[in-house]
């Protein structure tokens, strides 16, 4: 099997599901190409069941490098430290509960190698609940760089767990800033502002695990305030004009503080359009 110069970067913490982690790791190690290294960051102490899954893959795959942190520090800080450990400039992100399609790494890596002036490549995702063959919706994102820049004014322009990026470009803007949430959205905004070029492949390269908790954690007063803080920074950066700032504050804040059942219906409606 061909081996590619890519570092896979993922984090796991104690509330992750061991069965889901196993599926995620299995999808990484059954790609059509082999990643040069897989860095798994243990964000604080884990459950015995999670440790068992990790040990079973360590014994089979020497490319798997496990780094344990004694305390849970959150995804952003953990990923920043993990980036420092990646030995390749091209880094593929992965979450501990999602499943890569078998051609994901090969497709993204070949695209980046053919387009040296681009820094970030992503794709669509197939959302599922229990069975990945039963896709409930597809999260589509725009393909071309100019369209991605415009889209980013209103919504996150890439699906984070599908992303493959150049480490140097991420570190040039300071990596994930943990004081702003969602950290990935704010990272993409700063990279776009810094002139980094993005592209989204117009096909699904990952199965994204969806549950009611997916929508629940993206709401509430705290999340709403975090989004407003990002919008304020976007305005100060000159990324959005004042009228879009005002419009976005009203729409996003109202949406985030809606009762969960209403927000759930709205989420389903958006995914169907």
What residue spans do the PLM features occupy?
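Catalytic beta-strand/loop signature of glycosyltransferases that borders the donor
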Residues: 124, 198-205
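A conserved acidic beta->alpha catalytic loop
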Residues: 42-51, 71, 95
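Catalytic core of nucleotide-sugar-dependent glycosyltransferases
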Residues: 196, 208, 216-241
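Acidic donor-binding loop at a coil-to-helix junction in glycosyltransferase catalytic cores
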Residues: 181-189
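Glycine-rich, basic loop-to-helix element that forms the pyrophosphate-binding segment
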Residues: 69-86, 107
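Short aromatic/hydrophobic "clamp" motif used to bind/position activated sugar donors
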Residues: 91
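Conserved donor NDP-sugar-binding/catalytic core segment of glycosyltransferases
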Residues: 103-136
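Short, well-formed alpha-helical segments that are part of the catalytic scaffolds
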Residues: 15-30
